[in-house]
A protein has these predicted regions:
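Secretory targeting signatures
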Residues: 1-31
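N-terminal active-site segment of His-dependent metallophosphoesterases
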Residues: 26-81, 174-175
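A general structural motif
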Residues: 37, 64, 159-163, 288
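Hydrophobic beta-strand anchors of alpha/beta hydrolase catalytic cores
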Residues: 40, 67, 128, 164-165
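Active-site metal-binding loops of divalent metal-dependent hydrolases
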Residues: 43-46, 71-73, 99-100, 133-134, ...
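Conserved beta-strand->loop/alpha-helix structural units within folded catalytic cores of enzymes
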Residues: 67-73, 167-170, 195-209, 282
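Extended active-site neighborhood of metal-dependent phosphoesterases/phosphodiesterases
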Residues: 78-164, 178-192, 197, 203, ...
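A short C-terminal boundary segment appended to hydrolase-like catalytic domains
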Residues: 256-310
């Protein structure tokens, strides 16, 4: 099916399925903004497979309102087969580009109305930043760095934005694969993690390894970058007012899963046993993120909560 049959009605800043409701109390000098609950999902490494179809079905049944694509979609020269699979959630999808998208990346850019491989948008009090791990030209890499720095600086100083979610394809942090392969993207780790710390990023979503991994809240370790600093050692999966982002790998969209080697100490949980997606509910008037990895087999494989008191 040609992508021309699709109609993209997704606005970068204002989403049709989300509304701000302002309640202005009579005789009051203050306006109280009430944020309706909303949710978003994320997955990467899809492929045109029955497993990918099951992931979309899982997302539809959950009723996701936004789908963050973490790269590697059709694994083919054309995007068409993946577009067929995600048709039920196409108008809710915002992508980042992966290495497996290869020669088809200009097609993805055109389909999703992108002028560059990095961009940002807002939904209520949540700021989303999509980045590229596939830029080859040094000038393009510098442009992205400047964009990210300026974007995060602006957002972190905006009192209307309580949450920052960053997403891209290759991982800043990951366990070794079975056999010892290290798929860490050093640029994402050493160049960008310090910025994520500085500007109070809450969650970093990534893929590339075809499995699921979740870290503790982490700060960058200048002395030993391979071993980030655990900001919190909480084991009850409930975090309040974080001072470092949680890195989540969701390479479980549908392409063949990868086994792990040894789990790194900075990871809370990892699994390669099921396909699925990360669902995040933004609730309690935008003050709480409740995240669950929803396996396509109907189980909740992992869950965690982040709350903010301000």
């Amino acid at each position: 099916m040609s992508h021309k049959t699709f109609s993209l009605v997704f606005a970068a800043v204002t989403l049709s399925f989300i509304a701000y409701v302002a309640i202005i109390q009579e005789h009051s000098a203050y306006a109280v903004v009430v944020f309706p609950d909303f949710n978003f999902g994320a997955a990467g490494d899809w492929g045109c497979t029955p497993n990918a179809t099951s992931t979309v079905k899982n997302m539809v049944e959950k009723g996701i309102e936004l789908n963050l694509g973490l790269g590697d979609y059709s694994y083919k020269p054309s995007a068409d087969c993946w577009l067929d699979i995600i048709k039920p959630i196409f108008n809710k999808t915002k992508i980042s580009i992966g290495n497996g998208d290869g020669a088809a990346w200009p097609e993805y850019m055109n389909i999703f109305n992108l002028t560059r491989q990095y961009y940002s948008f807002d939904v209520q009090n949540v700021h989303f930043l999509a980045m590229s791990t596939q830029l080859q030209n040094e000038s393009d890499k510098l442009d992205q760095l400047n964009f990210v720095r300026n974007d995060l600086n602006k957002t972190s100083s905006n009192p209307a934005k309580d949450w920052i979610v960053v997403y891209f394809h290759r991982q800043a942090y990951t366990s070794l694969l079975e056999g010892g392969e290290d798929r860490t993207d050093i640029i994402m780790r050493d160049t960008y993690h310090p910025l994520f710390d500085k500007y109070n990023v809450d969650i970093v979503l990534q893929a590339h390894n075809h499995n699921y991994q979740r870290s503790y809240p982490l700060n960058y370790n200048e002395v030993d970058p391979k071993n980030p600093i655990r900001v919190s050692n909480e084991t009850n999966n409930y975090y309040s007012d974080l001072s470092g982002p949680i890195f989540v790998t969701v390479g479980t969209g549908g392409n063949g899963l990868y086994k792990f080697g040894v789990k790194n100490d900075y990871l809370v949980y990892q699994t390669y046993s099921s396909y699925g997606f990360l669902n995040v509910d933004v609730i309690n008037n935008g003050t709480k993120l409740s995240a669950k990895f929803l396996s396509n087999n109907g189980t909740v494989a992992d869950q965690f909560t982040i709350v903010k008191s301000h």
